[in-house]
Amino acid sequence: MNKLTVRNFIVGLLIVFSLNSFSSPPSISNSSSNSIDENSPINTFKISPDNQTSKKSDLATEEPKGCKYWLSLFKPVCHRLHQVWTEGHTDLYLSGYAWHNRFTYSAERIREKKYNELAWGGGLGKGFFDEKGNWHGLYAFAFLDSHRNVEPTAGYAYLRVANITKEFKAGLGFSVLVTARPDIFHNIPFPGAVPWAGIFYKKLSVKAAYIPGSSTNGNVLYVVGTYSFDK
């Protein structure tokens, strides 16, 4: 009887021990599984926007196809022109005034020659503010010149811009262009470069170019207004 009691006692201990040993792993596995879920490599792998951003930046830094054949010295210029064309806002150009410098043109001469100062015209362009806040523009438009002939022009302009207020900006710079006039080279297109200035307010801007010259030609302040459309 004593042997049976001892045997039963030992068997009972073994059963209790075995139950404890089998019941404890689930809690361990749950905690371990939770820790695995929290620190699993899958979660860290999901932080892939960095990889996507790097891929996008790689794509953004890819050389435009049109710049592939440019000399390395001029490739930055090509990249900037491509950026203005692809990322810039579309600008509507409205031309309206050309002031003949009264210090080189007398009032009598202006009356005699009947110089036109209402330089009506218009066209389209692209405008872009770079990472420093300076403005780059591509444009093509036509207007009535001093003799009321239609003068086409196309070019690139750059303005170093200062922020006067949040919405109001002003800039100074230059423009390189190609134009054609019947009184100069008989309408054969020729290049030129002129100083530019501009003021910006929201989507509106007024830009002016001074065309140097002599007492019989040039010395004209040309003014054009632009409106920028949303992309």
UniProtKB/Swiss-Prot annotation:
Cellular localisation: Cell outer membrane
Question: Which residues carry out catalysis?
Answer: H100, D145, S146
Record keywords? Acyltransferase, Cell outer membrane, Membrane, Signal, Transferase
Uppermost EC category: transferase
Q: Where is this region: Disordered?
A: 24-59
Membrane spanning residue stretches: none
Q: Name one Pfam family in it.
A: PagP
* EC number annotated for this UniProt entry: 2.3.1.251
Q: Locations of Low complexity compositional bias?
A: 24-43
Top-rank taxon: Bacteria
- Any idea which GO molecular function terms this record carries? acyltransferase activity
Family membership noted in the UniProt record = Belongs to the lipid A palmitoyltransferase family.
According to the record's subunit comment, the protein's assembly and interactions are: Homodimer.
Q: What protein name does the entry list?
A: Lipid A acyltransferase PagP
Q: Which organism is it from?
A: Legionella longbeachae serogroup 1 (strain NSW150)
